[in-house]
From Swiss-Prot:
Key words, A-Z: ATP-binding, Coenzyme A biosynthesis, Cytoplasm, Kinase, Metal-binding, Nucleotide-binding, Potassium, Transferase
Reactions it catalyzes: (R)-pantothenate + ATP = (R)-4'-phosphopantothenate + ADP + H(+)
A GO molecular-function descriptor: pantothenate kinase activity
Documented EC number(s): 2.7.1.33
Binding site for substrate: Y69, G73, V74, D75, R76, T145
Protein name, UniProt field: Type III pantothenate kinase
Positions annotated as active site in the UniProt record: D75 (proton acceptor)
CC cofactor note: A monovalent cation. Ammonium or potassium.
Biological process (GO), any one: coenzyme A biosynthetic process
Assembly notes: Homodimer.
Main location: cytoplasm
Gene3D superfamilies reported for this sequence: 3.30.420.40
Length: 210
């Protein structure tokens, strides 16, 4: 069985505990796979997957989450189902933060990812076109422009997450998940969280719950 989480840039795959990613244009059929299931926030990339795996099944219509949130993306739903309790942070081009309690989604928010902060600052002034310093010290005020930009972007993200997690366990996934997790003592980095939610949905389908 092959699972695919189709994001804004990459197609993320999961098979027998292994996780990897591919760009749509580089996607090729691998070994013969009888079962392929996917979720997608990118229709063109989903069409590309279906060109390679025409029998792939979209799990979105079968995915259900106990929430009052209107319009919650299927990727966020899968991540929430993958943890059941705690705060899940999916740190990609955008960062989503969702709070779960006893399998109930209490709400969440979206903010720019680290790379997006850099792009926004560059659009303000050419003088702010600096590569962010991911090693910047957050406990001391910066003494140069590059560190000042880096401090402002990274500390804003970290503090937003801190204010939301309270005493809950934090789960990080996504491209910048491992980097952000190091700022939190109670953090777990797991790039299979979304796939765990997809697997749970498949279990519910087999049990006739969906």
């Amino acid at each position: 069985m092959l699972l695919c989480d189709i994001g804004n840039t990459y197609l993320h795959f999961y098979q027998e505990g292994k996780v990897w990613k591919e760009l749509p244009r580089r996607l090729k059929a691998g070994m013969e796979v009888q079962e392929v299931y996917y979720i997608s926030v990118n229709p063109p990339s989903a069409r590309r997957l279906l060109e390679v795996y025409p029998h792939a099944i979209d799990l979105a219509p079968h995915m259900v989450l106990d929430t009052a949130y209107k319009g919650l993306g299927v990727d966020r739903m899968a991540a929430c189902k993958g943890i059941e309790d705690g705060v899940v942070v999916d740190a990609g081009s955008a960062i989503t933060v969702d709070v779960m309690q006893n399998q109930v989604h209490l709400g969440g928010f979206i903010m720019p990812g680290i790379a997006s902060f850099s792009s926004m600052l560059k659009s303000i002034s050419p003088a702010l076109e600096k590569e962010l310093n991911l090693s910047v010290e957050l406990s001391a005020l910066p003494q140069n422009t590059r560190d000042a930009l880096s401090y402002g972007a990274i500390k804003a993200i970290v503090m937003m997450i801190q204010n939301s997690c309270k005493n809950k366990r934090l789960f990080f996934t996504g491209g910048d998940g491992k980097y952000l997790a190091r700022f939190f003592e109670n953090a777990i980095h797991d790039n299979s969280i979304v796939f765990k939610g997809m697997l749970k949905t498949l279990e519910e389908m087999k049990e006739g719950k969906r």
